[in-house]
Amino acid sequence: MSELTTVARPYARAAFEFAVDSNKIEAWSEMLFFTAEVVNNPTMVKILTSDKTAQELAELFLNVCEDQLDENGQNFIKIMAENGRLRFLPRVAQLFAALEDEHKKQVDVNVVSAYGLSKKQLDELSKSLEKRLARKVNLHCSIDKTLIAGMVVTVGDLVIDSSAKGQLGRLSNTLQS
């Protein structure tokens, strides 16, 4: 995954900077996610791993995408094809989305709770996280009964574990040391 990210990051940044400069962030996001779907198609996977030249791959790819790409999007695909990077488009789209969220001061938050949370609890959690993170929060909730009680909140690499399962695990580690 790290090679994938290392290779995809400069393309995502370049696309994002261009999208911001041309005020077309939403259009670029749609184009990149469409091309990511094309790359993930099983037939296209076979074609991308074949011995076709970069120019043949670019032409074929652009024919498949037809009207989904504007002129700049087509040029982006041609550059990626010339550099043998078309297979990295799904990761480019993901990184582009992360840059878009950062630009919009948004963050995705995963909330795993032992039981379903009420609308009031979700609103309070959202307000609290928005204040702490200084970002607009998009909550993604799920239920895991093995937590016993409480919740685990994950924001990027920040994990806030207030579950009974987590507390019992920490207590066990403390007692064993």
From Swiss-Prot:
Compartment list: Cell inner membrane
UniProt topology in membrane: Peripheral membrane protein
Disulfide links within the chain: none
Gene Ontology cellular component terms for the protein in this record: plasma membrane; proton-transporting ATP synthase complex
Pfam hit, one: OSCP
Domain of life: Bacteria
Self-association state and partner proteins as the record states: F-type ATPases have 2 components, F(1) - the catalytic core - and F(0) - the membrane proton channel. F(1) has five subunits: alpha(3), beta(3), gamma(1), delta(1), epsilon(1). F(0) has three main subunits: a(1), b(2) and c(10-14). The alpha and beta chains form an alternating ring which encloses part of the gamma chain. F(1) is attached to F(0) by a central stalk formed by the gamma and epsilon chains, while a peripheral stalk is formed by the delta and b chains.
Similarity remark: Belongs to the ATPase delta chain family.
Protein name: ATP synthase subunit delta
